[in-house]
């Protein structure tokens, strides 16, 4: 893993303390304790965050939703530099136990991937950003206790899944990660009104991705299958609104649902 521009090992002082304490307690930390390593074809892997200090730049995205494009680019680059520095630290810093450091150095960037961006992915994975506050904001209860909807356009079933959102220092001199949740849900219905604006604000807009949902609800709804469900319904609803000369908030919901069923929507 190459040394990133502006690399400063002090940025990973907490990681060094964590590794030192793990050694003191007799814990054996390997690569799979530092990150999720999912095998892929051709001896490659897909990695993801795992453990208290990993590939997530905790708290670094806090200002992203309200930021202008220049600030978003800066936040984007900060995430890139964090991940690059994290891997470089594990592969090179003397604070890392030899066993772990040697294991990390058995891996590297895939030489045939992302060749025009120095083998790093082209795009930041943005789980959440700015969302509409419309006619109906879906919340945790809509996933767990109020799972049926009269204006349902489809179903969701993915866990409420959020990584940590902040790291809080304590008076005792430690830190606490906050925000991680992995809560199973039973299949629930998705409300059409979650993607319609308030009627007094706009009558000809449907929002199938940045729809109205709380952080907890969006942690399940944000998956690509749900985006496709919203998009399918949005297309049919837009056509109906145009042909019927009505605002999107006043379309015939049973007629929309009938069309969706006829097109094998669930």
Please annotate each region the language model reported.
Residues 1-266:
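Flavin (FAD/FMN)-binding glycine-rich loop and adjacent Rossmann-like elements that form
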């Amino acid at each position: 893993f190459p040394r990133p521009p502006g690399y400063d090992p002090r940025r990973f002082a907490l990681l060094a303390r964590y590794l030192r304490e793990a050694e003191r307690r007799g814990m054996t930390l390997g690569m799979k304790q530092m990150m999720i390593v999912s095998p892929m074809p051709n001896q490659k892997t897909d990695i993801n965050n795992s453990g208290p200090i990993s590939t997530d730049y905790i708290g670094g995205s806090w200002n992203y939703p309200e930021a202008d494009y220049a600030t978003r680019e800066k936040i984007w680059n900060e995430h890139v530099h964090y991940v690059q520095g994290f891997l470089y630290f594990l592969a090179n810093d003397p604070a890392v136990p030899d066993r772990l450091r040697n294991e990390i150095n058995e891996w590297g960037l895939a030489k045939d991937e992302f060749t025009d961006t120095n083998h790093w992915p082209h795009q930041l994975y943005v789980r959440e950003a700015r969302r509409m506050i419309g006619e109906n904001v879906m919340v945790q209860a809509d996933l767990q206790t109020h799972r049926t909807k009269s204006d349902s356009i489809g179903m969701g079933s993915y866990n409420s899944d959020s990584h940590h959102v902040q790291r809080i220092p304590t008076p005792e001199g430690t830190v606490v990660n906050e925000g991680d949740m992995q809560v199973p849900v039973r299949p629930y219905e998705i409300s059409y009104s979650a993607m319609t604006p308030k009627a007094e604000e706009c009558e000809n807009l449907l929002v199938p991705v940045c729809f109205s949902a709380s952080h907890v609800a969006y942690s399940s709804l944000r998956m690509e299958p749900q985006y496709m469900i919203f998009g399918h319904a949005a297309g049919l609803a837009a056509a109906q609104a145009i042909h019927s000369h009505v605002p999107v908030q006043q379309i015939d919901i049973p007629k929309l649902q009938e069309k969706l069923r006829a097109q094998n929507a669930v």
